[in-house]
Amino acid sequence: MRLPFVSKTASVLICIITLGYLVILGHTILSPLFFAFLMAVLFTPFANLLERKLRFPRGLSTIFSFLLLVICLVGVFYFFITQSQHFADDLPKLRIQIMDVVERGYLSITQEMNIELSQQMDFLQKGLDKLLGSSGEILGFTLSIFSSTGLFLIYSMLFFIFILNYRRLLYKFAIDVFDEKHRPKVEKIIMKIQKIIKQYIIGLLLQFILVGGIVSAFLFVLGIKYALFFGILTGLLNVIPYLGITFSGGMTIVFAWATNGVDLSIVVMIGYVVIHIIDANIILPFVVGSKVKINALFSFLGLIIGEKMWGISGMFFSIPFLAILKIIFENIDGLEAWGQIIGYEISPRKQKKKYQITKNIVLEELD
């Protein structure tokens, strides 16, 4: 018996609202659990390699995978923290430079338009003291990307170990919990999710390296101080669509304006716009692929809802969660339309983008 469209839609919406409410209540546990799930899927091929090729027992392969993950995370955080510390040490000097530049600008305006300067400068001074005096909060935002407490990392590492060690048991449970007739489709969905998650995370890592490298090189050529710091920050925050590069670009433009003048800050702004266009139209399609692409409407909604539910970590997790949801909807009878509306409209006649790098190397857009 097929349910009427209104009943089916109402059922889906009720399930989504109920699930969303439960997710909000359990964000302290579910946020690190979801992060650990993503990392476990990424490290599963490495663990399988250790077990099949090197004959490692399950526990030992899990430990080696865990150590590799810790080394990667510690390396990234150590590098970023040291760079952030150098930047934080110069914030008082930056405040003085900003005040000097603004004062000269206001002075010229005052002379031309006879506007009282003292009250404006007092207001600006208080604003800068509040903004730059809270450097700990600024760095806390960039360094505490996933959570404001250390419990997130502790929970994540524990969940990562358990999920990776019991991955076959969890996989068997996910299959056996359904009726026999549905198991082939469930297995197909799980395999697709694994493939898409690995493709997405590896693509994000490549995107982080490419965008961070391009921005660092661009700022270094312009002579901007802390070019590497701003490049890494841009690559890291670029994981958050639209908002990430806007935030990091705004910081870089303000810094360039305060230290190098208006002309160079305009060049930096134009450069960020060009880099974003390159990232959206060349880097993202080739390193991530269209199957993970979520349209702008649902990306923005996902960012807003994710931030309201889980804070900053929710903004990071919103896109992979929507990608998983999209795959599930596309493979369930009657819910295909929900999966289609989340993604892009795909034209059957549209050809994949190709770029001839060399005679033997061709860069082709991923599915």
What are these regions (language model features)?
Residues 1-82, 160, 322-323, 329-367:
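Anchoring transmembrane alpha helix of integral membrane proteins
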Residues 2-21, 30-34, 60-67, 85-109, 141-158, 205-209, 212-219, ...:
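Hydrophobic alpha-helical transmembrane segments
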Residues 7, 145-257, 262-268:
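Alpha-helical transmembrane segments and their immediate interhelical loop/hinge regions
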Residues 36-40, 71-72, 160, 232-239, ...:
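Hydrophobic transmembrane alpha-helices
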Residues 46-54, 76-154, 167-168, 173, ...:
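Juxtamembrane membrane-interface segments in integral membrane proteins
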Residues 53-65, 117-124, 183-186, 226, ...:
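Membrane-interface starts of transmembrane alpha-helices
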